[in-house]
Amino acid sequence: MTLKEEFIKLGYTEEDYEIIRNNYAVNQIKDETLIKKLKDNFAFLLKMGYTKEEVVKMTKSSPSIYGLSKENIKQKIKDMNTLGYTKEEVIKMTKSLPQIYSYSIENMKQKIEDMITLGYTKEEVIKMTKNSPSIYSYSIETIKQKIEDMITLGYTKEEVVKMTKGIPIIYSLSIENMKQKIEDIISLGYTKEEVIKMTKSLPSIYSLSIESIKQKIDGMIALGYTKEEVIKMTKTLPAIYGLSIENMRQKIEDIISLGYTKEEVIKMTKILPSIYGYSIENMRQKIEDIISLGYTKEEVIKMTKGLPT
C-alpha cells in the first residue's frame, strides 16, 4: 500500500495528504519511514485519548506531529505537567492548538515568564492558556501591542490585564474587530463610554456577535420590556447579555411562584436588573428572613414590589 493510500485508509482526503506530505516538517522524510510514523503516531494519539477525527484535524493543522517520535510526545506531556497542567488539560489544549507539540518547553516557560512581567501571576497564565491555548502561538510583542491598542480604546493596562484573565480569547481578536464591535453596539443606543464600561464588567461581550446581541434585545422585548429599557438595564448589568432568554423566562416563572405577577417581576427587574443574577433559593431565604423579623409573606411581597432593592 502506498503512503497516500495509508493516509486515505485512516480518514484523510487526497487534499489532506498533499497538504501534509508537502509540509516542510515532513517533506524530507522517506515514504517508508513516514508510513511507520503515520501508523505509530496515529495509533498512539488514539490511545492517548483523541478521537480519529481529532487526530486527522490536528495533523492537518500541524503535520510536524508526524515528524515526532512517541517519546517526544510523551515527554512534552510530562514537561507540561511540571508547568501545572494535567494530562487531560494538555490533551484538550492540543486539540485546538496541536502546534504545542512542536514548541520547546523552554519557549513555553519563557512565554509564561514574559506574561508574568505584564502583570499576571503564573497561576493566571496557566489558567488563561487552558482556556485559550493560542496564547502560546503569539509573540510577546504581539501581546504587548494588543494591550497598547486596547489602551487607545479607553482601557487602562490594569483593566486589560483583568479583562483578559477572565476572557483570554480577547488576545485572539483583532483590534479592528474590537473597534467594529464597539461601533455596532453604539448603533444600538449606547455611548462609547458606556460600551467600554460594560465590557470592563463583561469582557465576553467581545466574543458575542452583534446578531446575538440584537436577538437578546428582541427576546427581552418579547418578555415585556421596551428596547430603551433593555438598553438601560444592560448598562447597569451587562451580564444580562451572558444569560439565555430561556433562563430569564425561568427566573420570571420562579419569582411568580413566590407570589408576584409577571408584570410586577418585569417592573422590579427594570428597577433592579441584578435580580436576574440572584438564585431563587436566595430570594426565598430573604423572604423567610424578613418574615422572621415580624412581617407576613404578603407584606414582604408588597414591600419588595415597590422597593426591590
List the predicted regions and their residue ranges:
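Long amphipathic alpha-helical repeat/alpha-solenoid cores
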Residues: 1-309
